[in-house]
Amino acid sequence: MSMATEVRYDCATDGFILHTPHRHAAKFMPYIALEGQPKSSVVMARLWVGEQDCGIHPFLVPCRDARGALCQGVSVSSPDVLDLPYFDVVDHAIITFEQVTLPRWAWLRGHEHDISAGGVFHSRLASQRDIFFSSLRRVEWGKLVLTASLIPGLKLSLALAIHYAQQRPLHAHNGRVIPLAHHALHRRILTRAYVTGLAAMALYEGIKQRHLPDGRHSSRFQTDAGLVKAVAVELMRTSLQHCMQRCGAQGKFLRNRIAPTLQLCDLVGTAEGDSMPVLMKVAKDILAWPDESQDDDTPLGQLLLRMRRQMNQQLADATDKLAAWHDLGCEAARLGWLAGNLEALRHLGSRDDIRTACREQLMLDYAPQLLHHGLCSPAEIAALPARQEATLDHVWEHHAARVPDEFDVRDLMAATPLGSPDLASAWFALAPSLHDPQPEG
């Protein structure tokens, strides 16, 4: 709400003038540093109509013209200033605006706001806070679009990591040669990555299908888009990290595609709003939901209700509501994370074994809270690790070998060394200058 970039309505042209008033109002923006392509950006700025502060609104701003040159009044830092390790993916830059003229249509006002012919601002919304969140809703679909960009790479990464575990030979002390997947810890970590990735994709797909018919007009759209951004993206990040770690050095090579996907995940996690404040906003919305919308008659569903009631009571009892909300930040994050994961479970469809594995992991994560609220006994919590290991072994046995076909990525796997049936031969084919010894055996 401290947005300093300003845009002023110009009665003479019925347009706007966008301006960066001081250094602290400069923006970090993606897709803008490199020349050669036309580029536009959605810029959030404080709208002034005369002397009236009309709140934060989105504006569509042409930044580079058809030749890729900067538009008049737009200045950006050179590509080497923001030295991101993945510069080739998103060309971030620092950007400022100096009296940039915008046409009337650049104002993404929706149906809630207008400026009359006499230069008077009108809004159906009651406060600047409502205006701000209405403005955010105008670009909320971006959270889903960005999340969707991760799914192909996530599927390929899971298929590659599982394939590597099945193909990588280990020489045991007794002379036997066994695959890496023979080690229970390794395959269970990968299976957990697999079910976590499926949960993330189910959350994204379920919420997308819920809102496609009505666009952004549902009262829950902003909260649901936040769940995708704050929960689905972070679940994908966890899954990708396991994939890269379980492939060792092989997982870090760019040509094996896992590392670039993890880098992209990092970018998505901070685009369209950083995941943590988005999760906090989701938690605040959840506090107002009716009980019946979350009551699924399970220990985790009951836990969500109890955490919510407890937080509402603490906020109601507080003299300083804002200070109380800040003090409850960790609890709010746990509430939002639990709500997002429960939503993912609902969208996993008929895959009962996948849902069971996800639920057992979630119960382990929330074991202290389940015990505190008396929703599980100590004996039930103590039995969870062994139960989950058995569930993960079942999922590995019945699904792991079919992951490349389930995700339809065999052609993509074939383009990577990790996806080759003979890893050593794949690398030697890429390095003809190497002395090639006789194949093993």
Summary of predicted features, one role per range:
Residues 1-441:
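Flavin-dependent oxidoreductase catalytic core characteristic
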